[in-house]
A protein has these predicted regions:
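Juxtamembrane helix-loop-helix connectors linking adjacent transmembrane helices
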Residues: 1-27, 45, 113, 118-121
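Juxtamembrane/transmembrane-helix boundary motifs in multi-pass membrane proteins
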Residues: 11-15, 19, 45-49, 64, ...
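Residue-level hotspots within the lipid-embedded alpha helices of multi-pass solute transporters
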Residues: 12, 24-29, 33, 74, ...
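Hydrophobic alpha-helical transmembrane segments of multipass integral membrane proteins
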Residues: 18-27, 31, 56, 60, ...
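Active-site His/Glu-centered metal-binding helix of metallohydrolases
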Residues: 29-34, 38-39, 63, 67, ...
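Small-polar-interrupted transmembrane alpha-helices in polytopic inner-membrane proteins
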Residues: 50-65, 81
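Functionally important transmembrane alpha-helices
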Residues: 62, 70-121
Length: 121
């Protein structure tokens, strides 16, 4: 199993697949409210534009995921952060980013569960 999967499984070792849905939803809601809803909008006001606000909030978002991710996975985290930021700006709502984030997290948890087989119950 790759290093990144091992690290994530250590964070959530006792979750059953049915418990992934509320966890994924809560993570998506929390992170999007903090990083896109609060931080990015405040940075836009402070910098006068969305581009710098997106970049700065992505740097913070990625840095805070560094303890649980490998360097190569951090690239994916940064790209996802930019995508969620663009969706928020484009739709003028944080709701689509929350849904996308929750669905992504749910898919990752389920893939890890399938990859782990019987060793992760």
């Amino acid at each position: 199993m790759e290093e990144n999967a091992r690290r994530i499984m250590e964070l959530v070792p006792n979750l059953r697949p049915v418990e992934f849905v509320p966890v994924a939803a809560l993570i998506g809601v929390y992170e999007e409210l903090v990083f896109r809803g609060f931080l990015m909008t405040r940075l836009r006001r402070a910098t006068g534009g969305w581009t710098i606000a997106m970049i700065l909030s992505t740097v913070v978002f990625t840095a805070l995921h560094a303890f649980e991710q490998t360097p190569s996975a951090l690239v994916v985290v940064a790209i996802l952060s930019l995508v969620f930021s663009l969706v928020t700006i484009w739709r003028r709502s944080i709701i689509p980013a929350i849904i996308a984030h929750a669905l992504f997290d749910l898919s990752q948890f389920l893939l890890l569960h399938l990859q782990a087989g019987d060793s992760w119950k």
